[in-house]
Amino acid sequence: MDFFSFFTSYLSSFNTFALWLIMLFFCFSSVLVFLKLFGHVGLYVFSALAVIIGNIQVLKTVDFFYSPEPVALGTVLFASTFLCTDILSEHFGKEKAKKNIIIGFSSFLFMTIIMLITIGFKPSANDWVQESLANVFTPMSRFFIASMIAYLISQYFDVWIYSVIKRFTKNRFLWLRNNLSTILSSLLDNTVFSLLAWIILNPDPETLYNVIMIYILGTYVLRILIAFIDTPFMYFSRLFLPKNND
């Protein structure tokens, strides 16, 4: 058996929530490694990767013990971009944090355009991946628009509210500004995306009740948990700053 096939088969034997926690700690630890090795540029790179991979991963749904409905993956990767933004705001300033948002947005836009062109090529007679690529990389336009608008609004809000709390508390209570900014920004992200994708841009709109209960609150429980878990990583980030901290 191929190693990767064996590895994924082995992982599928894990409890879903346990595997989710493993992915969470791997992503957050990777943020610190990128910070240590490459400084703020490393966080730009990580955020770009997280936005791209998260928008692919979100296509897969899994069952969690707390939800009667399937829950889309991607939450961890999207949440890790908020950790990057908060670290940038804390140690490098909000202008670098704002630049990180644009880099993440531009990276996903570039990837989408390139993959649409790739799918547009007429496949050879022996090609066997065209249909699979089309299923993954041909997004419904309403999901693409909703995702990008929600990303920009929630990320810019995160930078703004983080700086407001930091100024109001006079640089004290790192845990407070980290948790509060992430919790509020995540709620805004879920709300904007869900309203756009399932009601405003949907030709067959869902009921507001279903959107709130399934799509907005469905993953928000996990995002609140993530906000608390990423707090130690915010404190550890001080130890992972490169020597030339610019």
Located regions from the model:
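Hydrophobic transmembrane alpha-helices
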Residues: 1-88, 92-95, 102-105, 109
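Alpha-helical transmembrane segments and their cytosolic interface
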Residues: 8-19, 32, 170-177, 183-201, ...
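Membrane-interface alpha-helices at helix entry/exit sites of multi-pass transporters
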Residues: 95-103, 172-180
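Hydrophobic alpha-helical membrane-insertion segments
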Residues: 103-113, 180-188
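Transmembrane alpha-helix/helix-exit interface in multi-pass inner-membrane proteins
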Residues: 107-125, 151, 155
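Membrane-interface interhelical connector segments
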Residues: 117-142
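Helix-boundary and loop/linker segments of multi-pass membrane transporters
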Residues: 132-138, 167-172, 204-209
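Hydrophobic alpha-helical transmembrane segments
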Residues: 140-154, 218-230
